[in-house]
């Protein structure tokens, strides 16, 4: 990780978050992290994917994102859905869903890193749950596009910093099957 960047949550914050959400006390040795700085992908789609995989086990998140890459299952869109196609027959209750293939591939790489970090720390990978997933804006790469009559238009390529934190939980509180939070309209 670059020196100028740090994780957004400390170990104490993660321990408090897990106790608040799952009612389980953990130690800092049960925490695994993964960080991917300056990934060239869409920030908006990254936020949606990060929100979606939060609360899943590692295996659930990996299988879902692999299905997104194969275009079998979409990712539901909650925030950035203005001027998007709303389907007449909603997908499992979500009228707006997308297949962000490039973002899913990058998140699969970060999940692979997270799984290796969990194994290195001696955690049981089957009981590891993603408790924090964040996608922050990175720096912008300036580009120039030539236009007609000698003009030029500047456009910036965006980058995203992806951060995942996972915790080993007891079997009693593991999510059995991932359920979508359906929105009642």
UniProtKB/Swiss-Prot annotation:
Which is one Gene Ontology cellular component term of this protein? cytosolic large ribosomal subunit
GO biological process: one example: cytoplasmic translation
A molecular-function term among this protein's GO annotations: rRNA binding
Q: Which Pfam families match?
A: Ribosomal_L22
Keyword list, A-Z: Ribonucleoprotein, Ribosomal protein, RNA-binding, rRNA-binding
User: Origin, by domain of life?
Assistant: Archaea
Record-linked HAMAP family? Ribosomal_uL22_A (MF_01331_A)
Function, as annotated, reads:
This protein binds specifically to 23S rRNA. It makes multiple contacts with different domains of the 23S rRNA in the assembled 50S subunit and ribosome.
What family is it from?
A: Belongs to the universal ribosomal protein uL22 family.
Binding partners and assembly:
Part of the 50S ribosomal subunit.
Would you tell me the protein name for this molecule? Answer: Large ribosomal subunit protein uL22
Which species is the source of this protein? Answer: Pyrobaculum aerophilum (strain ATCC 51768 / DSM 7523 / JCM 9630 / CIP 104966 / NBRC 100827 / IM2)
Q: What is the lineage of its organism?
A: Archaea, Thermoproteota, Thermoprotei, Thermoproteales, Thermoproteaceae
